[in-house]
Amino acid sequence: MTIDQMTIDQMTKIFLADKESTLNLGILLGETLTAGSVILLEGDLGAGKTTLVQGLGKGLSITEPIVSPTFTLINEYTEGRIPLYHLDLYRLEPQEVLSLNLEIYWEGIEIIPGIVAIEWSERMPYKPSTYINVLLTYGDEGSRQAEITPFNCTISDLIATK
């Protein structure tokens, strides 16, 4: 399946049978999203947010291991097709997030534009003008569900045409 075939221009729910399915969704997004794309990730602990970002890295041809930046807050991976900026706001309060000036990542200020993936994005006091929200929830027997919602954009606005 390609991202074009998914036609996610409004909220779409995708069943993810296992960890590999979550990884594959990330790979698909990494292969097709363009620089400037922002993915806001929500979900309980262990729901698959980091796994999805690991897939993004694979889709971007990043070879170094993608790890959760829970304690470093931001991990930057710049050797792929385009850079990946992986943020984790789990330990922060909204006022602390405000002081990070996250807009430098999605506006490409002082950094090379890339894909921005933010775990625990519900802690953000403000959001970019356009983004994709991905809510990961638990299903039965280890499965997950991804609820993907574009805000002020369509997926087709964000994908690279070949």
Swiss-Prot record:
The positions annotated for binding ATP are: 46-51, 141
Classify the source by domain of life. Bacteria
Gene3D superfamilies, per database record: P-loop containing nucleotide triphosphate hydrolases (3.40.50.300)
- UniProt cross-references to InterPro entries, sorted A to Z: P-loop_NTPase, T6A_TsaE
Statement: the UniProt record of this protein carries the keyword Nucleotide-binding: yes
Query: Which key words tag this protein in UniProt?
Result: ATP-binding, Cytoplasm, Magnesium, Metal-binding, Nucleotide-binding, tRNA processing
One GO-annotated biological process of the protein: tRNA threonylcarbamoyladenosine modification
Q: Which cysteines are joined by disulfide bonds?
A: none
Localization terms from the record? Cytoplasm
Chief location: cytoplasm
GO terms under cellular component: cytoplasm
Ranges in a coiled coil: none
Q: Which GO terms describe its molecular function?
A: ATP binding; metal ion binding
Which annotated residues bind Mg(2+)? 50, 119
Pfam families xref list: TsaE (PF02367)
| Similarity-based family | Belongs to the TsaE family.
Q: What does this protein do?
A: Required for the formation of a threonylcarbamoyl group on adenosine at position 37 (t(6)A37) in tRNAs that read codons beginning with adenine. Is involved in the transfer of the threonylcarbamoyl moiety of threonylcarbamoyl-AMP (TC-AMP) to the N6 group of A37, together with TsaD and TsaB. TsaE seems to play an indirect role in the t(6)A biosynthesis pathway, possibly in regulating the core enzymatic function of TsaD.
Q: What protein does this entry describe?
A: tRNA threonylcarbamoyladenosine biosynthesis protein TsaE
The scientific name of the source species is Nostoc sp. (strain PCC 7120 / SAG 25.82 / UTEX 2576)
This chain is encoded by the gene named tsaE
